[in-house]
Every structure is written in structure tokens, then in C-alpha cells.
């Protein structure tokens, strides 16, 4: 993202989106662009694999579609209302940690934590989704609502 002022994202020879790296990161036009830009890539899960409370937050145009959240918009919480998940992988990267988790419904979620994490594979955790940072996609993968 730091190599250019403007980026063209192509898929099968067709232009998907043109814009600054941050425009593509913050306002992708579809799920393909959303997952193409950023490392680790955006978490995208079918709404059907997420708890009812998350499904209820989706705009009507995203029903049956998917939710996208960047790893920095997912947090591990002690709140009982958090989404249950199990740690499947921990990547200690020095100044930050990537925690890969799976919900009982089957959604795979990556959490970017700014500090070192003390989690281990198999640990039960609770996840908090910052839905103010949500990207909603329809059943065709088109963006129906991006972060404000």
C-alpha cells in the first residue's frame, strides 16, 4: 500500500476498483477488493455463520450476504456478551500478535492485537466486533455499506 498514490485492482483482466491505497482499504467496492488489500486480509464471514446478534445488525440489503471486518476491528473481550470462539493459531510478531479463532458456527476470524498475547491454541475466548467499522456485502459480494 505504500508503493503508489493510485492503485488499480484487476481481476481476470477487468478493473475492479481504482483509487488511493487508503480508499481501497477503507471503501472497497466489493469483497474481492476488500480481501485483496491489507495484511492480514479482511475477515469476511457469511452472515449465516455468525451469531444472531450480528445478523440482526446487518442492513436489509446485506441479508444472506457477508460481514467484513479488518483484524484491527475485532477484539478479545471478557464481556459475557462477546462472541464465543476457540483459538486455532497464534502468530507472535513482536510488537503485535495475530490471533486466529473460529466460532462454533464456523466463522474464521483474525484478531490483530497491539500487544503480546498470552493465548494458546485451544483457548476459549470471547470476541467483540466493532460493527461501526463493518463492511457489508450482498450475496454477490458487492459492497452494500462501508465504514462511514
Question: Where are the regions a protein language model picked out?
Answer:
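ATPase nucleotide-binding modules
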Residues: 22, 26-88, 101-119, 142-148
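Short, conserved beta-turn/loop elements at beta-strand boundaries and strand-helix junctions
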Residues: 90-97, 139
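Catalytic metal- and UDP-sugar-binding loop of GT-A-like glycosyltransferases, i.e.
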Residues: 9-10, 69
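A short, surface-exposed alpha-helical micro-motif characterized by mixed small hydrophobic
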Residues: 1-2
Amino acid at each position: 500500500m505504500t508503493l503508489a498514490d493510485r492503485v488499480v485492482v484487476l481481476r481476470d483482466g477487468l478493473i475492479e476498483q481504482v483509487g488511493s491505497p487508503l480508499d481501497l482499504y477503507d471503501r472497497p467496492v466489493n469483497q474481492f477488493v476488500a480481501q485483496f488489500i491489507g495484511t492480514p486480509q479482511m475477515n469476511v464471514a457469511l452472515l449465516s455463520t455468525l451469531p444472531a446478534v450480528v445478523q440482526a445488525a446487518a442492513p436489509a440489503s446485506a441479508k444472506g450476504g457477508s460481514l467484513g471486518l479488518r483484524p484491527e476491528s475485532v477484539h478479545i473481550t471478557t464481556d459475557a456478551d462477546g462472541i464465543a470462539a476457540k483459538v486455532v493459531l497464534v502468530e507472535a510478531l513482536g510488537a503485535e500478535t495475530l490471533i486466529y479463532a473460529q466460532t462454533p458456527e464456523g466463522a474464521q476470524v483474525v484478531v490483530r492485537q497491539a500487544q503480546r498475547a498470552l493465548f494458546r491454541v485451544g483457548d476459549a475466548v470471547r470476541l467483540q466486533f466493532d460493527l461501526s467499522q463493518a463492511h457489508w456485502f450482498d450475496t454477490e459480494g458487492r459492497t452494500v455499506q462501508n465504514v462511514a
